[in-house]
Amino acid sequence: MADPSSYRPAPGTIPTQPGVYRFSDAHGQVIYVGKAKNLRNRLNSYFQDISALHPRTQRMVTTAAHVQWTVVQNEVESLQLEYTWIKEFDPRFNVMYRDDKSYPWLCFTWTDEYPRVFVGRGAHHKGWRYYGPFGQAWAIRDTVETLLRVFPMRSCSTGVFNRAKNQGRPCLLGYIGKCSAPCVERITSEAHREIADEFCDFMAGRTTKIVKRLESQMAEASENLEFERAAVIRDSLGALSKTLERNAVVLGDGTDADVISMALDPLEVGVKIFHVRGGRIRGERGWVADRADDADEAELMETFLTQLYGVNASDGQVRDDGHGNAVPPLVLVSAEPTNPDVMSTILSSERGSHVEIRVPRRGDKATLMDTVTRNAQETLAQHKLKRASDLATRTRALEEIQESLGLDRAPLRMESYDISHIQGTNVVGSMVVFEDGMPRKSEYRRFSIKGFEGSDDFAAMHEVLSRRLRRLIEDRDAMAAAQTPDGDVGSLIDPTTGSPRKFAYAPHLIVVDGGAPQVHAAQQVLEEFGLEDEIALCGLAKRLEEVWLPDEEWPVILPRTSEGLYLLQRLRDEAHRFAITFHRSKRSKAMVESVLDGVSGLGETRRKALVSHFGSVRSLRKATVDDIVEVPGFGPKLAGEVVAALSQDKPAEAINTATGEVVDANGPDAGR
């Protein structure tokens, strides 16, 4: 590893203008490319205290041996040059969004004399037209089968086409009306290309013109008493209607747009894009990438747009609108890129006309963005599930944790704890269990903190761990007392409850959320019960994802792509999620009781019915008298008193103790 100071540029030699820089290793291989408004400020940040850098950035600057830069005139040029260098050098420390190459596309071999339509995957060919990608291959194949009745163009392979041509006899599709049989010259090359062009128009969303033309032809055939021809056209219209029904209108104004959303976690980012043409979803696609540093969603979005409409567009990987334009006139995003005007200028240049980039705030575009966001979250969740459920991956993760933390065995049972509250009220704790790298949800536990009042995370964690470890000791003692004279161990079933003694199993590793202070507090509890030599302990700090051990001055830094770190993060995040869920439930119940104390005739049963029906105080506040009357046990008079009580009680501000953010105490995100 190189010392960054060994290749640091001399003071004053770095310009203050905007530009693009690149780090290279000792072999001259470019390993990172970046851009900056002020090159001096940005590059100097890499040569400060290395411990303050992001772990991945630390590895980059210690791997590098040289740094070079190029000054440009403005941010547009810097973004373009950055993209060019990333494409040319493929630097391994840059975030690269790579998608599943198995996505199916609808392909038109436009460079052939008689273009062919087929469903394909993999690399794209220059000059061909592509539509998609699509989520399911069977769905687009079914659509093609239907549309070939309306647009009878060639769909056979080159071998089949040449064989039919040599034999002078078309294949079956030519006989059943699903191909115009250009192989036997039933149709000219120009006429066949017109059919293919109409097929492309339909896939691009320009359906109105085609439907009107067919309706006009059907009416004309009927007037001329050509009923057989009219019936064929009627069937074609039915096929089009069937296809359009499968692909409902999502944007009523017939917009051409790409709708892009991101789902983030500390280690990875999931991206989903819906290609909307003519107001209908014509394709979708998903990506997952490792987060290389602490870049926020705006920076990640800028990187993604650059790669999507730069690298992918040049390779034919972005949906064409039928006119050779990979970039639509409107790009809807879940977060604006860092430099939206600059990005808009670049995309406008790529398209040849103005491209608008914006975040939808209301209407059908905002509704569609919500759908794309849910799909992005699902893309990331499915990726994480696939990664976590693989046996070889889980085994490697446990081995990495064992080696990195210096454990004498793999931590087959791990437990993680978290505390949740708002301003010291409704303090709760959670315990989640992973066995063999997978959640064991039947052994999750929730704790209502009873030993103190107020906001003291350390005292709350002390109580939670003490209660858990006390049960461990008690269950062990009970098992020892039940040991038979012949040496058989006591039953793992509690004779008083008939339930398994689940607390009798000691964890191999306890994971707490936090750094050195949180680990020290948890270690004190282990020492109080004499379990510090039996149960290993670590803390996982947010942001830098450092692993802290008891009595260690420095944290353990696991590689960013480590399966061990990924497993520890999942365990910690699951404890956080479980604690917040319990806190919200408890807080909602307490708020209902507090707000409705003065309403006569409203007992515990009816309060529970309100909470069950509306789900939260926030939803209950929005309810009208008519809404509340629908709840069993509530008449108009009682419902009116509830509405009056809620209108007098205004929600107070609350502080999220994890972030310091002011939140709505009744909101869905309140709680820590």
Swiss-Prot record:
One of its GO terms (cellular component) is cytoplasm. GO terms for molecular function: DNA binding; excinuclease ABC activity. Residues 208-243 form the UVR domain. It holds the Pfam family GIY-YIG. InterPro entries: GIY-YIG_endonuc, GIY-YIG_endonuc_sf, GIY-YIG_UvrC_Cho, Hlx-hairpin-Hlx_DNA-bd_motif, RuvA_2-like, UVR_dom, UVR_dom_sf, UvrABC_protein_C. It is found in: Cytoplasm. GO terms for biological process: nucleotide-excision repair; SOS response. Residues 16-95 form the GIY-YIG domain. The keyword DNA repair applies. Keywords: Cytoplasm, DNA damage, DNA excision, DNA repair, Excision nuclease, SOS response. Interacts with UvrB in an incision complex. The UvrABC repair system catalyzes the recognition and processing of DNA lesions. UvrC both incises the 5' and 3' sides of the lesion. The N-terminal half is responsible for the 3' incision and the C-terminal half is responsible for the 5' incision. Belongs to the UvrC family. This is UvrABC system protein C. It comes from Cutibacterium acnes (strain DSM 16379 / KPA171202) (Propionibacterium acnes).
